[in-house]
């Protein structure tokens, strides 16, 4: 009986970590239980994070561009596994004038009860990002403003905001390169 319960619990956790939410409801993978419903369609870019030098980065400055955001953590296995493919996609898209590719993490991971002390500082995160070969911008949600705005409950989470500043889609879980490219192309 204990084995059956553990198998059931493991299945629930696995399903919970791979949900897809489409705010336009045009995909068969849409969920009516949208975590992005807390985000006003007109204010998806209305928040500020920090860059590696501690400077404010206001995402509203990217209005008029398609914005992809990857929320991740150094202690997250799926986050680490998807980085090589994210890097490949970044290399393909980085020179497009109408496109912004960002990653956001939190140096304190206050949003997550299982926070790993390895992420206590930006320096640790920057060092790990370099070790993993990340060349795309790594930004810091030091006040959990972005995580709260998007009702983040898991990492990795992928956010797609169109050039009108409207949240188009969220995807929670490890994303495959082909699917990421498909979602990015649908924003154009």
What is the meaning of each model-derived region?
Residues 1-4:
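Positively charged n-region of N-terminal signal peptides that target proteins for export
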Residues 13-16:
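C-terminal motif of bacterial Sec signal peptides marking the signal peptidase cleavage site
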Residues 22-59:
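N-terminal "domain-start" segment that seeds a small globular fold
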Residues 71-88:
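Conserved redox-active cysteine motifs that mediate thiol-disulfide chemistry
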Residues 109-119:
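Short, flexible/disordered intra-domain loops and linkers
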Residues 117-161:
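Short, internal strand/loop/helix patches
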Residues 154-188:
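Thiol-/selenol-based redox modules, centered on thioredoxin-like
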């Amino acid at each position: 009986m204990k084995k059956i319960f553990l198998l059931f619990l493991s299945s629930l956790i696995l399903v919970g970590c791979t949900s897809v939410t489409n705010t336009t409801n045009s995909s068969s993978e849409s969920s009516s239980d949208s975590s992005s419903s807390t985000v006003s369609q007109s204010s998806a870019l209305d928040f500020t994070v920090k860059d590696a030098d501690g400077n404010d980065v206001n995402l509203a400055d990217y209005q008029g561009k398609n914005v992809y955001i990857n929320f991740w953590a150094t202690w997250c296995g799926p986050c680490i596994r998807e980085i090589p493919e994210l890097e490949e996609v970044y290399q393909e898209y980085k020179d497009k004038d109408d496109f912004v590719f960002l990653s956001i993490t939190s140096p304190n991971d206050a949003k997550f009860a299982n926070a790993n002390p390895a992420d206590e500082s930006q320096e640790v995160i920057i060092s790990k990002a370099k070790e993993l070969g990340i060349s795309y911008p790594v930004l810091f949600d030091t006040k959990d403003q972005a995580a709260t705005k998007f009702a983040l409950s898991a990492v990795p989470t992928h956010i797609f905001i169109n050039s009108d500043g409207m949240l188009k889609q969220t995807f929670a879980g490890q994303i495959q390169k082909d699917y990421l490219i498909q979602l990015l192309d649908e924003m154009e």
